[in-house]
Amino acid sequence: MNLSGKKALVTGGSQGIGQAIAYRLAAEGADVVIDYVGHAEFAQQVVTEIKKLGRQAIAIQANLDFVSEIQGLIQKSVEGLGGIDVLVNNAGVEKHAPFWEVTEKDYDFVLDTNLKGAFFVTQAFVRHRMDVKQPGKIINISSVHEELPFPHFTSYCASKGGMKMMMRNLSIELAPYGITINDIAPGAIETPINTQLLNDPVKLKALLANIPLGRLGQTSDVAGVAAFLASNDSDYITGATIVVDGGLTWNYSEQ
């Protein structure tokens, strides 16, 4: 895939799946903005590594809970790279709690980042592409839990289900402007957020028994799909969810 000339913004791009996507887009020729909310040193390290590939990269801090910061993020991204034509909505959080114990604070913590944040980052990106009268690509990092239940993570599932329907609606609204939008739905991916699971042999064995390919996914598995969706090879794909789960969705039973 050739992403030469592409300029991408990856939210939550300093760690985990977002970091892997940022590296892969750069390796394919794109310049990249790394959005982060904390741990500036992680974001700066990603910038340093991307520059070693001969690409432009900048890190911008923004809390996606606030629309004013989102607008600033898009403005700074455009100024820093001379425009952005690929948006990767990767930033996301989760909160484990039985439904009857979820507080308003817990709910807002998850929905503000996962859905509200993605909604308004996408809106600001679309306005930019309309202003310059050019097409664009939006890639949402959703989850298999936009379809599958996940007990004790109801707010998370609600956010990803909402992201799915936002994507489907926008695929119709944005098509006349040449802007495509798709979801990537990762399954169980080996990232720092899953450290507790990885250190629990019993839970890990039960999970792997649900995955036909018999292994956890790697961040590179997701990054490869993101690079494809950012490329011209995906120009006729919009409104789709690409599942990256080793077959988990079709062989799933909640433990």
Model-derived regions: residue spans:
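Active-site helix of classical SDR
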Residues: T122, S159, M167
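Conserved glycine-rich cofactor-binding loop
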Residues: S14-Q15
